[in-house]
Amino acid sequence: MGRSIFINGVSGISAQTEEAIFNNEPLVYNSNIFNAVPANYKEVIPAMALRRMSKAIKMGITTAKNALLEANINVPDAIITATGEGCKQDTEKFLETVLEQKEELLTPTSFIQSTHNTVGGQIALNLNCTGYNITYSQEDISLESAFIDAMLLLEADLDINAVLVGSVDEVSPKITSFSYLNTSEGAFFFVLSAEKKINSKVEIVAISTFKEKDVLNISVEIQQFLNSNNYTISDLDIVLLGKNGDLNQDVVYNHLAKELFSTSCILGYKHLAGDFNTVTGFAMWLTCKIFKNNHIPNVLKLNTNSCQNPKLGLLYNLSQDNTTHSLILLRKI
């Protein structure tokens, strides 16, 4: 891609707050489900509308509008949303109603609000945005797919000045409890532009996804990704690994940490935010905050390598089925 892509606004809601992380006092959870810390939704959404919204919609609209506010944008030219599992709470409501009413006299509200593109549609309605609007749902690379689409859109259409890109996933009482993983929820939105502005803080250098099972070939893919963007492993200041405690995944993460990133400052984040399909949104939000604050909290560090002024960060994540990999390269401006 020829044009530089900049992040001009960022907002996130997750199981941790910015203050908790950067004060090295993270919130502690005693169950395998980490619930997102609620934002002050009433500041962004009218009370009457708020009562009818699920958590996913509340989080999505709030983070989207806060990111736009930071970027000084009223209405974006396009909205691209990512979700791994959609609006699970409304899905549960609809399925329970189907069973309780024996498939008769069903109201459409829960069904309509359970579809994966609900959040993107609600954001567009709230902002009165009639531009390009699409939702990606590719499990663990949903957000990466959304970002790649946004970058292609900014590359192809010079009339597009601001693209709102983000992700939303939520937990639900029944469906989520089926899993024994440390799972969580969150919403993260970013305002992208091909034009560098005063409030531009981070550049998205490149994003890539690939499939590979052999750990040695994974290392080769990562090095080729960096080389294609005129960087090497030694250029990396911080590396964020999506390590989640899964023993099968640890084989890959531990190999990369020891053999490939041994000189870099390696950070983890899933021990704080849990793991879910679009958790890379938390990693991107966190990297933007590290660049902004010029500080790496000790609670994130997975090794003893230090970095006083991080300017280049690589985010690596492995899908829950251990087959799909994502790479996101971010540079501080």
What is each model feature region?
Residues D159-N161:
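Loop/turn elements at helix/coil->beta-strand transitions in domains of secreted/extracellular proteins
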Residues M1-Y132, S137-E144, L152-A156, G166-I333:
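Conserved "HGTGT" condensation-loop signature of ketosynthase/thiolase-family condensing enzymes
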Residues F147:
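Short, conserved alpha-helix that lines the donor NDP-sugar binding/gating region
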